[in-house]
Amino acid sequence: MKTIFIIDSKTIDLKYIRNWQNNIQNTLEDYIQQKGLKYVVQTIYDIQPNPLTIIDDTPLTFKDIINQQASQSSRFAELFYNKKVSQGDHFIFMDAWNPAIFQLRYLSTVYRVPIWIHGFWQMGSFNKTSYLSFAKNLIWQKHAERALFAAINYNYYDSDYHLAMLKTNFKTIAAKKLFNAPNRIHKAGPPMEHVRDYAKQYKGTLKRNMILFADRGTVDRQLIIFRELQRALPQYEWVCIEDKMPNETQYHGLLASSKYVFISDLIDSSSITAFEAIMHGAIPLAPNRLNFTEIVPEKWRYPSEWTLSYVNYTEHYTQIIEYIKDKMENYDTYKEGIEEWALHLDTNYYRIDEMKRIIFDIQE
């Protein structure tokens, strides 16, 4: 009997991370049961999850993250010492930027128990919007990331946009050889099965003249722009989820009722909000930058310079107002093709089919 360990990435029930972990566990367990395979799936928590609203007012501090990673290293040591790890077991990290991976690989080596490590790459010094890239000298970060990449057997990226960024860390001959090694890197996840389920549940929901702000109002998401547009165009219904504090079911109900979701992010993400919107038939009004250029069709994107800063927004204020009016008045025209694009995203993004193939050695 082999064990698939899923490593908890957050100590609290945040908007996405806990869903990703649950989706992976459920997907793997369903396949194991369906095929009658001899595997068990176990999530390793350092603190049991707490139920929170979709918006968390107290996100983890860097101290919390370091403490959690130290706790994970201790848990790994206990597992190996107590002979709870067997040859061929799998360890899945939702965030590949985790120094506990080094300790896990060390334990596997000294106890002579070969294991397989999987890691999802989300952020790193290769991403210029990540806090890991803010230092003037990035030498140690790049070396650490290449070492993590080498310690992980199967590295995963969620979009071609992120793959291109990750490649920038592997420019030397030796680094390129590592990056291009067979089966070293794959496209997968993070899995969004719960979004697919909610999309089916809310299919056919009546659309309101609503524009939704579907993220926390952090500085890098520029909620101030949404607030000013709300005051300028009161004829439309503007909803910020920070004001509603919905639970997950209510959150997806708001998405299903919206015609548009407004996005003005300055930091890179996996464009999950845009994916959620499209799956619910809501059009994401996203800037022509970051990985929105891959997830959101060009006809729905607005020029990046319009919201590169608050100053930029004021300079392009009139254009943005006319843009919003046009979108609202011609929703039926702009929504054409949204079901086809939703199918494209559903088929090619936010899935773990490739991970399943690797773990269970599925032959095509």
Where in the sequence are the language-model features?
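Donor nucleotide-sugar binding/catalytic pocket of nucleotide-sugar-dependent glycosyltransferases
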Residues: A150-A199
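Active-site proximal beta-strand in glycosyltransferases
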Residues: H90-D95, S108-Y131
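N-terminal pre-catalytic "stem/leader" segment of glycosyltransferase-like enzymes
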Residues: M1-Q103
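Membrane-proximal helix-turn-helix segments that form the acceptor-binding/catalytic region
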Residues: F134-N155, A256
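Aromatic "clamp/platform" in nucleotide-sugar-dependent glycosyltransferases that forms part
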Residues: D265-I267
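Short hydrophobic beta-strand element within catalytic cores of glycosyltransferases
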Residues: I283-A286, T293
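Conserved catalytic-core segment of nucleotide-activated headgroup transferases in glycan assembly
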Residues: I17, E193-E248
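A charged, aromatic-enriched C-terminal amphipathic alpha-helix characteristic of glycosyltransferases
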Residues: A70-S71, T307-E364
